Structure formats: structure tokens, C-alpha cells
Amino acid sequence: MSWIERIKSNITPTRKASIPEGVWTKCDSCGQVLYRAELERNLEVCPKCDHHMRMTARNRLHSLLDEGSLVEMGSELEPKDVLKFRDSKKYKDRLASAQKETGEKDALVVMKGTLYGMPVVAAAFEFAFMGGSMGSVVGARFVRAVEQALEDNCPLICFSASGGARMQEALMSLMQMAKTSAALAKMQERGLPYISVLTDPTMGGVSASFAMLGDLNIAEPKALIGFAGPRVIEQTVREKLPLGFQRSEFLIEKGAIDMIVRRPEMRLKLASILAKLMNLPAPNPEAPREGVVVPPVPDQEPEA
């Protein structure tokens, strides 16, 4: 027996620990290994470098609205492959795959509820659903959100995270840009606030329509915001773009957005702004969550 075999006989192999999949994750920015549950408690913000990772639509709405107040709207609306569109894959197959992966029927989730006791309607994009692209159902759900805000005489908040219009729906997708913008004009006529929160990324037809039409346009840190992407622009102008081009910090320097707010501070900041705009008491984070009295819907003047 060789000396190597004698050493091997005295070694007792340890039992390999089984770690369930999804317990740990890695920060996309700094590479820090993070405990998944802790990251979720921190609203998907890296505790080391403050990188704001992408957040699901439902988690975002649940983190915003008061617990027990959420009521979903427009969930019965489902996308249809009217054009029988096919690129490298059938559109209906892409829809089925996205629905299975995300558990959502389409890329926008709309809920009404309360924010520190104040009635609001909120919408959030699910970027994992075909890149948060805007099709007819996204447009219809957004209009439904506007109509609900008008009915309840309350503010509307939308969290955008989209690559733009959904090419598989062609002109029906592009039509949603005008449809959603026209709906927001009714909010303006009524004098109800609409706050647009731009998250990473907000691009294309969404940025060219309702995402930039807020009475206040707020962005998360380092969010990519624009129409065409930086690579497309560089290839078109054949020049190297400035560092941080199209990021929220660049845009606020140019006056394209109103403010940048970190995700953990977003809830209180939105509530404080809306309370001022609606002439309601300022939210108190320490006080128990109670409903507030919202001014009644103003009488409509008869049309001439």
C-alpha cells in the first residue's frame, strides 16, 4: 500500500450541504453575493452598492399600497394574436411562454388601494413579460386605471419599465400611445395628479407617451430612460456617447425629469407629494394607517 492510499483511507468525506435554488443571488452591478430574502426585504436594492435591481410588478404594488387595501383591475383582459404574427416564433407561443414564466396575462398590472390611507390607483409594468412591451391589453389596462382614478376622484401613479411598443401587434400597439395620452388629458381636465415613476429601463413608445406625461416625472437612480437605446444612437451618429448618457442622473441635469428618488424612500415621498397636491394632511409614518377624507367629485358642467 502506497503512502497516498494510507492517507486516503483516513479521510472521511463530509456530507455535501444541500442549498435550495434561489436562496442566494448576485448583484448585477458589484457582484456581491446576497441572501435572497434579505434582498427582497430591501426592495431589491443592493445593500452594498445601492444598485436598484428590477422588481416584479406585483411586488412593487404591494410595497407601495397599504396592506389589505389592494384591489386588482383589468385582470380579465387578455392579449389576442389578431394578426397571426410570426417572426422567429409565433406570437401566441411567445405570449404563452411569457405567461408561464411570469404568471401574468400581460405586461401591466393595475390596482387600486390606499397610500398612507389616501385612495390612489397604481399601475406597474412587468418587464419580464416580453420586455414590458406595450400592446393593446397594456393600453386598455392603463385607460382602465385612468377611468378608475376619475371615478374615485383620486391620483394615479404608474411605474414604467418597458422596452417600448410590442412589434408583434404592429399598428395596434402604436395606437396605444395616442390612446393612453388622450386618457391622461381627462386627468388634467379634472385637476387630478398623475405621477409617472420611471424605472430601469423606460424606452421606446412608452417613454414617448404616458411615461413622460406625468405632472411629476420621478426616476429611480441610474435608470435607463429614452426613446432609442444608446447602442442604436451610437451606430446612427457614429460617435461615442457621453458616460451615463440616458441615465436618470444625466436627464435630471438636462431638466428632462423632476427628481430622483431611491426605492426605499419612494413610498413616503409619493404620499407626501400627493397629499400636498390633493390638499390633504401630510402622511405620518408613525401613525396607524387610517383613511382620509377625499374631496368629492366636482359637478360636471353641462355641455353646450
UniProtKB/Swiss-Prot annotation:
Give the pathway listed in the UniProt entry for this protein. Lipid metabolism; malonyl-CoA biosynthesis; malonyl-CoA from acetyl-CoA: step 1/1
> Does the keyword field hold Metal-binding?
yes
Q: Which GO terms describe its molecular function?
A: acetyl-CoA carboxylase activity; ATP binding; carboxyl- or carbamoyltransferase activity; zinc ion binding
Q: What class of enzyme is it?
A: transferase
Cofactor mode of binding and number, as noted: Binds 1 zinc ion per subunit.
Q: What is its EC number?
A: 2.1.3.15
Instruction: Specify the domain of life of the species encoding this protein.
Output: Bacteria
Instruction: Report domain CoA carboxyltransferase N-terminal positions.
Output: 23-292
An example GO biological process term is: fatty acid biosynthetic process
Indicate the principal place this protein occupies in or around the cell.
cytoplasm
Its job: Component of the acetyl coenzyme A carboxylase (ACC) complex. Biotin carboxylase (BC) catalyzes the carboxylation of biotin on its carrier protein (BCCP) and then the CO(2) group is transferred by the transcarboxylase to acetyl-CoA to form malonyl-CoA.
Q: Give the similarity note.
A: Belongs to the AccD/PCCB family.
Q: What is this protein called?
A: Acetyl-coenzyme A carboxylase carboxyl transferase subunit beta
Organism per entry: Shigella boydii serotype 4 (strain Sb227)
Question: What gene name is listed for this protein?
Answer: accD
